[in-house]
Swiss-Prot record:
Protein name per UniProt: 3-isopropylmalate dehydratase large subunit
GO biological process: L-leucine biosynthetic process
InterPro entries: 3-IsopropMal_deHydase_lsu, Acnase/IPM_dHydase_lsu_aba_1/3, Acoase/IPM_deHydtase_lsu_aba, Aconitase_4Fe-4S_BS, Aconitase_4Fe-4S_dom, IPM_dehydratase_rel_enz, IPMI_cat
Highest taxon of source: Bacteria
Matches recorded under Gene3D superfamilies: Aconitase, domain 3
Pathway: Amino-acid biosynthesis; L-leucine biosynthesis; L-leucine from 3-methyl-2-oxobutanoate: step 2/4
Family indicated by similarity: Belongs to the aconitase/IPM isomerase family. LeuC type 1 subfamily.
Known function: Catalyzes the isomerization between 2-isopropylmalate and 3-isopropylmalate, via the formation of 2-isopropylmaleate.
Residues that bind [4Fe-4S] cluster: 353, 414, 417
Pfam families: Aconitase
Cofactor note: Binds 1 [4Fe-4S] cluster per subunit.
């Protein structure tokens, strides 16, 4: 009998029942909530008179709509200028209070982006099923967890039953071998992968990232890669448990203690794919061949190495793809064969659930230390992923490095990743962003988003256009 993949093991542990239509009912260990996708779910519970099935399986925090300036964060929620944003944050507070859910409220130092604080607090643990009303819940798979986003109706279902109806996925292995050169990061790995297999390449798959390169990554780097598995079309991204996983979790507030910890670790060590496990698809990447990546279009698959040029649609033989390239270039205001390094930036954003952890801020600070943001850049901002990340960065003096260079040092939140709060691009503005999506209007109506790593974003802020961070730091 063939061995099992990590995904297969976690599925089998959590499958409650199989249904006649081929779907299954799976048990959910951890449910994370935020202010945008939860209000209707709570209202549904009230209307039906249903209690929560397991209150302590849920944690919550506001992140999408919270402002990131000190002026709007001081005092009560009344300081939030936008009425819709204020209402959503207030509603989350009220719902959590009414149903007894533990919430990191807006001005709690532990507040932050859901996919940053879950692991940070130890609320995400190896072997868990983790869901949240947000597609980038795949981030938590970095801990050997089965994690994915759900819709609002499913949020209500999990609150009421602690179970979810879903279809079992196929298995994909992405194997990355070799040593990354300095200045090439986890963000570049996942962008290179998406460039290779496309945004539909992972459709229907749970993706396990493996190989020597992945094992060498920090937990922060693994979270970055799993975060963007969704941009490759997969619903799930995961990495097998190893000593780095266990060390990261140890001592965190929600992590097991004492004998419970010992028992948990013994179980976690088995959360790896068996040597003879079968994968339905295997994709291989060589770390040495990966260079710093920059997206130039309106999809994460529209990506090139920094030393390359914008593609020419006339060289595309597929008429559908050709039309897509033409539309993207028009929206982005670029010409075929423009060098990536010729793209000038109006704004730079370092943050989001992809790249706002302490390792990301350290990498960016290393680049900007002793340098200044280019005068042509209208705004450069750093938004830590949580209050604890912000506090740690300030202990290390990173805030001073950024401020002296001309960056704005903000309060935690989703910020400019998406146009749901005051941090937005103006029409036609180009932004070097460490976020995960570059769709039309993602950061503001008419805004032009270029996805990069924190180091590349920092280098672009200093130069005023894209540059190879490896050259800048020589």
């Amino acid at each position: 009998m063939a061995g099992k993949t990590l995904y297969g093991k976690l599925w089998d542990i959590h499958e409650v029942a199989r249904r006649d239509d081929g779907s299954s009912l799976i048990y959910i260990d951890r449910h994370i909530l935020h202010e945008v996708t939860s209000p209707q779910a709570f209202e549904g519970l009230r209307l039906a008179g249903r209690p929560l099935w397991r209150v302590n399986a849920n944690i919550a925090t506001p992140d999408h709509n919270v402002p990131t300036t000190k002026a709007e964060r001081q005092g009560s929620l009344l300081s939030i200028a936008d009425t819709v944003s204020r209402l959503q944050v207030q509603t989350l507070d009220e719902n959590c209070d009414d149903f007894g859910i533990f919430e990191f409220k807006m001005n709690d130092v532990r507040q932050g982006i859901v996919h940053v604080i879950g692991p940070e607090q130890g609320a995400t643990l190896p072997g868990m099923t983790v869901v949240c009303g947000d597609s980038h819940t795949s981030t938590h798979g970095a801990f050997g967890a089965l994690a994915h986003g759900i819709g609002t109706s499913e949020v209500e279902h999990v609150l009421a039953t602690q179970c979810l109806v879903t279809q079992k996925m196929k298995n994909m292995q992405v194997r990355v071998e070799g040593t990354l050169s300095w200045g090439v990061t986890a963000k570049d790995i996942v962008l290179a992968l998406i460039g290779k297999i496309g945004t539909a390449g992972g459709n229907g798959y749970a993706v396990e990232f493996s190989g020597s390169t992945i094992r060498a990554l920090s937990m922060e780097g693994r979270m970055t890669i799993c975060n963007m598995a969704i941009e490759a079309g997969a619903r799930v991204g995961m990495v097998a448990v190893d000593e780095k996983t266990i060390q990261y979790v140890h001592g965190r507030p929600f992590a097991p203690k004492g004998s419970d910890w010992d028992a948990a670790v013994a179980f976690w060590r088995g959360l790896v794919s068996d040597p003879d496990a079968h994968f339905d698809r295997v994709v291989e990447l060589s770390a040495e061949e990966i260079k710093p990546q920059v997206t130039w279009g309106t999809s994460p698959e529209m990506v090139s190495a920094v030393d390359q040029s914008v593609p020419d649609p006339e060289r595309e033989t597929d008429p559908v793809k050709k039309e897509s390239l033409i539309r993207a270039l028009k929206y982005m205001g670029l010409q075929p064969n423009d060098p990536i390094t010729s793209i000038k930036l109006d704004r730079v954003f370092i943050g989001s659930c992809t790249n706002s952890r302490i390792e990301d801020l350290r990498a960016a600070a290393e680049v900007v230390k002793g340098r200044k943001v280019a005068s042509t850049v209208k705004q450069a901002m750093v938004v830590p992923g949580s209050g604890l990340v912000k506090a740690q960065a300030e202990v290390e003096g990173l805030d001073k490095i950024f401020i002296e260079a001309g960056f704005e040092w903000r309060e935690p939140g989703c910020s400019m990743c998406l146009a749901m709060n005051p941090d937005k691009l103006g029409s036609g503005e180009h932004c070097a962003s460490t976020s995960n999506r570059n769709f039309e209007g993602r950061q503001g109506i008419g805004g032009r988003t270029h996805l990069v790593s924190p180091a590349m974003a920092a280098a672009a802020a200093v130069a005023g256009h894209f540059v190879d961070v490896r050259e800048m730091m020589r």
